[in-house]
């Protein structure tokens, strides 16, 4: 079976079935309610439950081992190979399954706000709410663009189809399979909508570097003077929260490209964690949850329709999906100039990293390659308490190419555009997870604001004896003692022990990077 026949087979299915194509949000919401897929909250948002899968299932994600990509992909635990015949057999079974459905839902749009690099997408869904999600998260076409739209990548999502591992070559009933030659993402067995979003991110992380564009797992915003900031970090570290700043315009909250012309959003919407969400702490996100947006796995009062964002009985990984247009000060189209400031976000479960530190270019490369954070509860199946982890480039689960490819591109751009880089710890202070407290959001916001406004450029710094980080001695809006993590611990000896423990993990993890310069090697912790 070749590309033409897989495409033709899908076209036949969509031609034979009753298919709602690029339906307005109101229609998709109505369909979702009639089909029993969800219910409305008091603000008109559609709330849904995703069943057993309330987060990504990385062990069920595969890339088809095809001739054109075989030598380029970094095969391993993240990028698991699956045979072409296995994929084609499963694809045929999924289409046969979808052919029995009374109706299907199709969305056509784009990934990539910069028209030079955008990818025309087609999303075919079994569920109406999944199609609404796709409409919110990807970039919607104009009426004219839709008439001329030719998909270059297609998502086929059939959550109700459960694979049989003994027959279908999968690990479980769930699967997310990317075929770069067939230009298809095949999803089944899981209702978690984030799989659609992240699979296209993986696709763009393969395609964009081939066009000399750095793809990045980061949020981005821009100030009134046109100064651009990037926030790198894994899920739950604060990308969405910190980039939603009423004094700056939002470019995007999670996925971006950086070309010779500047940065651009890959998406057209946001997918915000909403555990413990409140209007006081995050008014922009709170107000964006309205008609047309989707709430995943949030408990809602049956009588009042009020969401309880503190209830994590289904999962810690509760989410809100909404269009960028729901953010009043978003940049549309989501393109901007070159970054002035980069902030690496980490949620340090050990509680020993400073809340903010300035990085040298060598330290920036060291920490980008290290990608240290903690896996936070709920973002992946089986994670119920934070675990220390190293995720290269702050996005290893989504990077098909070798990490060095992305790191080299970032290093070149930091040097070319003289970008200031900071490491910000949004994790624990005063002790490790379970003992200390999560860093106050108000403190983190104050530190980020000071960094973006250049207020830390002339502040005296102290060099951390273990991590070598340059810690500002003062920062507007933050008590001085908070800036030095050792000061916040009651037991200083326990702090020293924990710091050494984390430093050893950094050093052990970095041993795998054998081809980096000695200057970068020495930019990490010393024990």
UniProtKB/Swiss-Prot annotation:
Species this chain originates from: Halalkalibacterium halodurans (strain ATCC BAA-125 / DSM 18197 / FERM 7344 / JCM 9153 / C-125)
Primary location group: cytoplasm
Record lineage: Bacteria, Bacillati, Bacillota, Bacilli, Bacillales
Location(s) in or outside the cell: Cytoplasm
Source taxon at top rank: Bacteria
EC number: 4.1.1.49
Residues the entry annotates as binding Mn(2+): 198, 217, 254
Stated family: Belongs to the phosphoenolpyruvate carboxykinase (ATP) family.
Protein name according to UniProt: Phosphoenolpyruvate carboxykinase (ATP)
Entry-linked InterPro entries: PEP_carboxykinase_ATP, PEP_carboxykinase_C, PEP_carboxykinase_N, PEPCK_ATP_CS
Pfam families referenced in this protein's UniProt entry, alphabetically: PEPCK_ATP
GO CC annotation, single: cytosol
Free-text comment on the cofactor: Binds 1 Mn(2+) ion per subunit.
Named cofactor requirement(s): Mn(2+)
